Amino acid sequence: MWDGEKMAAAMVQMSCLYRGMLAVRNHGIRPLIPGLVPSHFRAFSMKKEPELEENPYYSKYEEKIRKLRSSKPQEYESRLEKRTELKTEPLGRSRQAEFVKYMEKELDKRGKDGDGGFTKDKTLGSILNLEMVQEKSGAEITELWMQYFSKKDTISAVIPSSTFDVIFGRAKSCPTFLYALPQNEGYEFFVGQWAGNELHFTSLINVQTMGENAPSQLILYHYTDLQKDKDIVLMTAEMDSKFVTVHQAQCLANQVQLFYGSQRLETFRLVETFNHKPEEFKHMAVIAELEQSGIGPAVTTK
């Protein structure tokens, strides 16, 4: 269980991030698919919280918020109170120091409990006949890999060994980052956390409402089994299709390449700042970088 004060601090800064999100508008990207409501969830009346409901993704996670308020009303009210305490925090800045510690603790717990609905200890051998591909070249394996996953509702990639070494080396010192997914109403923020060769994503509002129970919604698997002999690293993913589409998963994967694999040091410096100088981190800088790279739409700032 997390320390209460650190949890509260994390909740406060996440509230500030969402005020920043609401200032950005974009009309070219389709919205997330609303989550399906499990039949066993009990319906009950819930007091409306205007500030929370102003978040454009409130409806997407409303059922999870209802469940939290029903099962842990004191914790729910405490989080809302902490959200109010820092309304004066400057837009564009966030208290990430507490948040980074918060996500590290989540990773530790998630490593012990696993992620519901996702394959545990997924190996390359469970996907590919490793004996068969030993005689094939890296180019031939690349073609097989991409053809196989082109028929699946997921994403895949073949990463050059040198590129992966850069990405993974940086991930060791900077395992956590905040990603911005373009949506109809601004951007939805996702937290990406490396765990070995896996990269776990969960939406920021999901962490905010679910706390330590927030599950991964997208996992990128990187297989290094053939890196030494074939000079390639194979990647594929699993996702919760109720919350993340294939198109959106590809956008997040592209951002990993952008922020962790870029030769432009100013780009990776955002990741370093998030991890090592969180008090200086500006989430709007992430959005600006996406626009400059062409991954995100044009951003109008006031």
Curated annotation (Swiss-Prot):
GO terms for biological process: mitochondrial proton-transporting ATP synthase complex assembly. Its main location: mitochondrion. InterPro entries: ATP11. GO terms for molecular function: protein-containing complex stabilizing activity. Pfam families: ATP11 (PF06644). It comes from the Eukaryota. It is a peripheral membrane protein. GO terms for cellular component: mitochondrial inner membrane; mitochondrion. The keyword Mitochondrion applies. It is found in: Mitochondrion inner membrane. The keyword Transit peptide applies. Keywords: Membrane, Mitochondrion, Mitochondrion inner membrane, Transit peptide. Belongs to the ATP11 family. Interacts with ATP5F1B; involved in the assembly of the F1 component of the mitochondrial ATP synthase (ATPase). Has a complex stabilizing activity in the assembly of the mitochondrial F1-F0 complex. This is ATP synthase mitochondrial F1 complex assembly factor 1. It comes from Danio rerio.
